[in-house]
């Protein structure tokens, strides 16, 4: 079999790439070494959709983090996957840690994260009454949320497959070689290699 693109790995990242490429008139294979999708790194995902204040300003990670977080509610709605926009707190237990919160807030604002605010002791205990009495402040990021990484990956792969992507399980790629025609060939533990341009 021959494909224009082969995506190695059916975790959340591979699934998203497959879904995006399924919008084009190309033949796409999504290959996964495990018996199903989301069985590698994705299974250990914390489910947190981070607001974007951690990444260093000006980096690709910072830009994609903020753009991805903004896109997540709409993506989840389209794929019928629950997204919970619960926000997040980074809690400080000393004045020195409050300085770190201020640095994170400034970094987040430079990255374009909307709505960041530092809450004082009274405000955080009003919002989170079970929080330790030792907490003195918190950075609140309203755009953070949670989504089940399994549900998101499964829905994304299903959408890609409905749009023409072919999904192969138990497909452990052991090498990538160029064949006589100049195409790349995936060598794997099953018979008959898959060619890709």
Model-predicted segments: where are they?
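N-terminal Rossmann-like FAD-binding beta1-loop-alpha1 element of flavoenzymes
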Residues: 5-29
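Glycine-rich FAD pyrophosphate-binding loop
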Residues: 23-41
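Short phosphate-binding/catalytic loops that engage adenosine nucleotides
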Residues: 26, 113, 165
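Dinucleotide-binding Rossmann-like beta1-alpha1 core, especially the glycine-rich loop
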Residues: 47-127, 136
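Helix-loop-beta segment of a Rossmann-like dinucleotide-binding subdomain
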Residues: 82-92, 125-163
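A short, glycine/Asx- and small/polar-enriched loop/turn
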Residues: 96, 131-135, 178-185
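Helical element adjacent to the flavin cofactor pocket in flavoenzyme catalytic cores
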Residues: 143-184, 190
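Single conserved hydrophobic/aromatic residue that forms the stacking wall/gate
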Residues: 188-197
């Amino acid at each position: 079999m021959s494909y224009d693109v082969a995506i190695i790995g059916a975790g959340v990242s591979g699934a998203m790439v497959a879904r995006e490429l399924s919008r084009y008139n190309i033949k796409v294979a999504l290959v996964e070494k495990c018996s199903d999708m989301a069985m590698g790194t994705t299974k250990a995902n914390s489910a947190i959709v981070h607001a974007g204040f951690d990444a260093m300003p000006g980096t690709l990670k910072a830009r994609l983090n903020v753009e991805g977080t903004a896109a997540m509610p709409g993506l989840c709605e389209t794929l019928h996957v629950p997204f919970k926009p619960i926000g997040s707190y980074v809690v400080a237990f000393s004045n020195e840690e409050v300085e770190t919160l201020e640095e994170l807030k400034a970094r987040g604002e430079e990255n374009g994260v909307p709505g960041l605010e530092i809450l004082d002791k009274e405000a955080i205990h009003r919002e989170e009454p079970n929080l330790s009495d030792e907490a003195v402040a918190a950075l609140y990021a309203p755009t953070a949320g949670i989504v089940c990484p399994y549900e998101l990956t499964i829905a994304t792969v299903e959408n890609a497959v409905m749009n023409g992507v072919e999904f192969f399980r138990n497909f452990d790629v052991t090498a990538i070689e160029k064949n006589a025609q100049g195409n790349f060939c995936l060598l794997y533990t099953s018979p008959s290699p898959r060619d890709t341009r």
